[in-house]
């Protein structure tokens, strides 16, 4: 019996060690995306003022993008895939510190600040942003394996027309708007606000979606640009390290 207890204790200790996360510091766990995926283009919206808040967001110290090592590795595969089709990836946001999410929450609570309404949420009253989950106190971005992005056409040297802008608050941003993302079938239709997207715009969204899903990412049902690594390494951890270039 004593030997059995000792064996059980040893096994428990081993399993406990096996559950220890591979990386122990932020700098070890994350990489600067352009170091891992050199072909990407960055337009970090929250470093500038052209975003739904209208200000630079807290925690964005440099116009760069960070991801966990695992997510960056998968994104490199996506990049290679779309390059073979004539595109590059363009990133709007990746890892987002908790202080940035807190900034969103404070902004959403200020009903008087509607500076950017006409550009990002013209059909919504700001008071519904919480109840409709456009703004939340926690974000998957803060776990470090989520990225917001689009496609850039290498032939035209322009963003691919997706029929809607990044961070548009409305049904027009949903992957199933005007089509079935599971089958890729375009169905047409109009939103409650009378908007629509063309078949080509829907198919452009599907090109991005397929490339991301083929290489280990999962989509969000309310944003065509938002993808999270399926096997994200820190599913319960919300980081607060600022966004800035990391040492290689």
Residue ranges and their predicted role:
Residues 227:
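Conserved metal-phosphate-binding beta-hairpin within the catalytic cores
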Residues 1-4:
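Positively charged n-region of N-terminal signal peptides that target proteins for export
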Residues 9-16:
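Hydrophobic h-region of N-terminal signal peptides that target proteins for export
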Residues 7-8, 231:
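Intrinsically disordered, low-complexity segments enriched in polar/charged small residues
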Residues 18-94, 101-221, 232-248:
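Extracytoplasmic cell-surface/polysaccharide-interacting catalytic and binding patches
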């Amino acid at each position: 019996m004593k030997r059995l207890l000792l064996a059980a204790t040893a096994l428990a200790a081993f399993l406990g060690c096996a559950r220890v996360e591979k990386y122990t510091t932020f700098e070890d766990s994350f990489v600067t995306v352009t170091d891992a995926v050199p072909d990407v283009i960055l337009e970090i919206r929250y470093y500038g003022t052209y975003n739904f808040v209208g200000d630079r967001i807290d925690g964005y110290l440099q116009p760069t993008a960070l991801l966990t090592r695992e997510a960056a590795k998968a994104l490199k595969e996506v990049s290679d895939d779309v390059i073979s089709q004539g595109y590059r990836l363009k990133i709007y946001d990746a890892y987002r510190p908790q202080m940035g999410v807190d900034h969103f929450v404070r902004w959403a609570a200020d009903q008087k600040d509607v500076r950017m309404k006409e550009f990002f949420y013209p059909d919504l009253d700001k008071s519904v942003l919480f109840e409709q989950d456009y703004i939340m106190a926690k974000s998957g971005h803060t776990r470090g394996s989520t990225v917001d992005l689009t496609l850039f056409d290498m032939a035209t040297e322009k963003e691919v027309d997706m029929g809607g802008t990044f961070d548009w608050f409305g049904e027009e941003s949903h992957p199933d708007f005007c089509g079935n993302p599971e089958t890729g079938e375009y169905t047409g239709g109009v939103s409650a606000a009378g908007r629509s997207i063309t078949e080509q715009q829907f198919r452009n969204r599907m090109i991005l979606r397929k490339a991301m899903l083929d290489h280990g990412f999962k989509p969000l049902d309310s944003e065509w640009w938002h993808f999270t690594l399926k096997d994200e390494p820190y599913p319960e951890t919300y980081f607060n390290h600022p966004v800035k270039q990391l040492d290689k």
